[in-house]
Amino acid sequence: METATKTPWHLWVIGIVATLWNAGGAYDYTMTQTRNEDYLRTAADNAGVPYDTMIGYYTSFPAWADAFWALGVWGAFAGSVLLLLRSRFSFHAFVVALVGLAGTTLYTLGTDLPAELNSPMMWVFSLIIWVVTGLLAWYARRMTKKGVLR
């Protein structure tokens, strides 16, 4: 007879915070892909970037870069939800997110970013996304090995 592994309290905390964090990324992705003018104008204003520069940058993405961005965003969101559902596939979703993040990062590094977008804050935020996603993948793997995720 198999004994059920008790769900540790930290899984719920990490899962809820991760889902909220990644829901923010999913919202940003959706608003950007649908070219929501109010959202993009506010984002441009908050970043101190001209609206035309921001919209020009996002509309210049090739399809493959958009695809990697989608993998990163939706993989991370799925991983967070799967973590709350105690599914071992949470780890796999976070790996998909890391692949998407790698593709998006390679595109960004290989692109001539408009000077207004190429700020230290943008690179710091990218690093934060890498760290958070990597830690979530590690956590999901660890919880799978402990039998918490099935």
Describe the role of every protein-language-model region.
Residues 1-150:
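Topology signature of small-to-medium multi-pass alpha-helical membrane proteins
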